[in-house]
Amino acid sequence: MTDKIRTVQGKVISDKMDKSFVVAIERTVKHPIYGKFIRRTTKLHVHDEHNEAKLGDVVEVRGCRPLSKTKSHTLVRVVEKAQA
């Protein structure tokens, strides 16, 4: 049985924790009455074993078992490094 694990891309907005960072994931949703598309943001706490991701990087993350009270995602790869 092969299940495709869902991965999402987002931007690192905080990397002050050791082996963790916060990523913001933007999505667009349609307003139920007016029909206008609105940007919504979700913040996720992500586990980063080797402290690879830095502030401003675009990263790919996937869900995993709960690692702490707020952390239940892990880093897959850094898609794009932030401008220095």
UniProtKB/Swiss-Prot annotation:
NCBIfam families listed in its UniProt record: PRK05610.1, uS17_bact
Pfam families: Ribosomal_S17
Descriptive protein name: Small ribosomal subunit protein uS17
Designated gene of the protein: rpsQ
Function: One of the primary rRNA binding proteins, it binds specifically to the 5'-end of 16S ribosomal RNA.
A biological-process GO annotation: translation
Family: Belongs to the universal ribosomal protein uS17 family.
RNA-binding listed as a keyword: yes
SUPFAM superfamilies in the cross-refs: Nucleic acid-binding proteins
One MF term in the entry's GO annotations: rRNA binding
UniProt keyword terms in alphabetical order: Ribonucleoprotein, Ribosomal protein, RNA-binding, rRNA-binding
Complex formation: Part of the 30S ribosomal subunit.
Source organism, top-level taxon: Bacteria
GO CC terms in record: cytosolic small ribosomal subunit
The species this protein was found in: Histophilus somni (strain 2336)
